[in-house]
């Protein structure tokens, strides 16, 4: 170990910064977060530091550095481009046994700054001892993605409750088990949902031995296919699941991110072949949660856009089961972005309408007259089976048969296919497309030939002649 990792209490302690430029400003911002009393030695200040001085956030000594300025200083940072001055600052500090840091000059440092993940009061510091700072930064970025921002609330509440827990539990082992259960159970779930008062109530119930073995349901949008489009929150919830109920639309790449020990149950439905009824899925969510399990209902795209997520949560709520919702990137947004088709464009479409091709059994009540108007984009989910009827209705209500259309099959995945043609050709294109597929109708489809970026470049056929672009 080249450096001993320490966490220093700088609240109201004097820290000297030699230098008044941008580098100094970055270090000063970190010192402010730690509550330090900052003194700056520099002939001039950057505009940012000048404003901080005017606001009374820093003290300014508008003079050259003198060793006497180190008297009663807790630590010092040299942030100038003058190597001679930096060396003098370090030597003077070292002589006085004051910790010193010369920015970007490790030999002249008695302490160094780590990469930091700040979830105060929880702070994670990462250091490569100055040998590989880029690697330390990459690790910090990974931890930023993995550690929920609400950890700060969790740690703060735990700090407030330490005394009460100690009064109730004399054994250190008993206290450890209490907190292990809290940090991985309902207390943590309530924190993640921002329900801080309820979280503290849960701690009180646990202390009183009234903890209920009640699970919860998390409705999570898995996105359109590319696992990279899964949200950080979605990943975090999936990593905590005891059981995952998923649809056929969820890609294998996303399923691979589920916690390894979690039970996986496919409740997917396909057109004309409903393997699990919706009622059975609803009841399964309730039953599993009542067993005390953390249940993730994983749905392709966004669960509240043609995903029946609202129906499922109504049943969960009626059963008194706690739940949360994690939005996902809906297929219309993800697939069109990967196909180079903007849903709106100032010159072509001032609105976009999302439509489902699966109609309720009591009939189709779509306003075809409104949908056939120009200067708008139609994004149709699950519409391949009814592509012929959709095309006929739009043309019958005034939409030009030469209106550009795209059928995007397996959008955002490595085997994505984009088929381009006209409204009159929609049925034929839909029959060729791999599923799941999204239908896009409108002038914005023409932009695909200019700004498609994912995989191979688009073919150069006319925007209104049939073309197939395999973006694998």
From Swiss-Prot:
The active site is at residues 247, 269. It catalyses: uroporphyrinogen III + 2 S-adenosyl-L-methionine = precorrin-2 + 2 S-adenosyl-L-homocysteine + H(+); precorrin-2 + NAD(+) = sirohydrochlorin + NADH + 2 H(+); siroheme + 2 H(+) = sirohydrochlorin + Fe(2+). Residues 1-203 are annotated as: Precorrin-2 dehydrogenase /sirohydrochlorin ferrochelatase. Keywords: Cobalamin biosynthesis, Lyase, Methyltransferase, Multifunctional enzyme, NAD, Oxidoreductase, Phosphoprotein, Porphyrin biosynthesis, S-adenosyl-L-methionine, Transferase. Residues 215-472 are annotated as: Uroporphyrinogen-III C-methyltransferase. Gene3D superfamilies: Cobalt-precorrin-4 Transmethylase, Domain 1, Methyltransferase, Cobalt-precorrin-4 Transmethylase, Domain 2, NAD(P)-binding Rossmann-like Domain, Sirohaem synthase, dimerisation domain, Siroheme synthase, domain 2. Its EC number is 2.1.1.107, 1.3.1.76, 4.99.1.4. The keyword Coiled coil does not apply. S-adenosyl-L-methionine binds at residues 224, 300-302, 305, 330-331, 382, 411. One of its GO terms (biological process) is siroheme biosynthetic process. It comes from the Bacteria. In the N-terminal section; belongs to the precorrin-2 dehydrogenase / sirohydrochlorin ferrochelatase family. Then it catalyzes the NAD-dependent ring dehydrogenation of precorrin-2 to yield sirohydrochlorin. Finally, it catalyzes the ferrochelation of sirohydrochlorin to yield siroheme. This is Siroheme synthase 1. It comes from Yersinia pseudotuberculosis serotype I (strain IP32953). The lineage of its organism: Bacteria, Pseudomonadati, Pseudomonadota, Gammaproteobacteria, Enterobacterales. The gene is cysG1.
